[in-house]
Curated annotation (Swiss-Prot):
Species annotation: Bacillus subtilis (strain 168)
Gene name in the database record: ywzG
Keywords: DNA-binding
The protein, known as: Putative DNA-binding protein YwzG
GO MF term list: DNA binding
S-S bonds: none
Length: 112
């Protein structure tokens, strides 16, 4: 299980990355993150939904309701143009940060 603070700090880029592919509802986002991470990333809905609401307030995502043939309506989220710009910036930042961490950890003998 990953450190909770690492997951929390990565939520924005994870959500925007997935929503850049297609609109998804909250539970679908949780499942997709788990699936793609080999179930290493077990994001709790209590972490995800406040992040979704914040991203929506910031204008990075928008939401809409969709009727279901069976079961209750689902609230889907989609990335906005502003969200795509933020995703591009955060992806560059992540790449720089990740490379820096790898260099530091390798230099100190902590990363293989």
């Amino acid at each position: 299980m990953l450190n909770r603070e690492l997951v929390k700090g990565s939520t924005v880029i994870l959500v925007l990355t997935l929503l850049n592919e297609r609109p998804m509802y909250g539970y679908e986002l949780v499942k997709e993150m788990g699936s793609r991470s080999g179930n290493e990333l077990q994001m709790k809905e209590g972490t995800l939904y406040p992040s979704l609401h914040k991203l929506e307030r910031q204008g990075y995502i928008s939401s809409y309701w969709e009727k279901q043939e069976k079961g209750p309506d689902r609230k889907y989220y989609r990335i906005t143009d502003e969200g795509k710009e933020v995703l591009a910036e955060r992806t560059k930042e992540w790449s720089v940060f990740s490379a820096m961490m790898d260099r530091i950890l390798k230099w100190s003998g902590q990363n293989g």
